[in-house]
């Protein structure tokens, strides 16, 4: 809910924070109605601050803030924050997965560009991660990646060849690549899917309940395994350099 100079009771999640002064932080938050927003959280680092235990990542919040800031119209001023409740903080691999999603949103979302449907999908994914559903984490991540790319206009149609717009040939396999879109697989190429599989994903993405429909399709182990490197490469292409920190950290941990 918003007035001319204030936004009240806005559903939000903290994506990232960094120091602003000895006692204050700048928060990058994902809000339902206003997209990614930067907020100055004054005094939040003080031990007596009521905001300090509330402003955590991967927790559903209700925020109030005044529009504009001191010398920077892009930075607004936090006035109130409440934990909405509903689930605990994800742990272990689920926590790392959640921080990975946050980094994607930080890299790919412009400020003050609303994505209400994407916000709702993100909130649902965070609830799954908080539930520690180990086997569900990978297909849930692939589903979010697909919907994020489609929402931002970075995912081509998956029922036709991107270069020719020709329908996918039955029985043929295809690869999704950053600069060429969906193309016929090369000989020996492993991270690929068949035409019917790509068509099923496209149909799911266009369904009314796109998240549930897409999750049902990519929950098959073969689908999730083949999609992972293709989607990660496409996301990294649009995120630019350097490599996503969360991905690098996960790679480092796996090598220990």
Curated annotation (Swiss-Prot):
Keyword DNA damage: yes
A Gene Ontology cellular-component term: bacterial nucleoid
InterPro entries xref list: ARFGAP/RecO, DNA_rep/recomb_RecO_N, NA-bd_OB-fold, RecO, RecO_C
GO biological process, one term: DNA recombination
Keywords from the UniProt entry: DNA damage, DNA recombination, DNA repair
Source superkingdom: Bacteria
Disulfide bonds: none
Keyword DNA damage (UniProt): yes
NCBIfam families with a match to the protein in the record: reco
Record family assignment: Belongs to the RecO family.
Function: Involved in DNA repair and RecF pathway recombination.
UniProt cross-references to PANTHER family, sorted A to Z: DNA REPAIR PROTEIN RECO
Descriptive protein name: DNA repair protein RecO
Species in which this protein is naturally found: Delftia acidovorans (strain DSM 14801 / SPH-1)
Organism placement in taxonomy: Bacteria, Pseudomonadati, Pseudomonadota, Betaproteobacteria, Burkholderiales
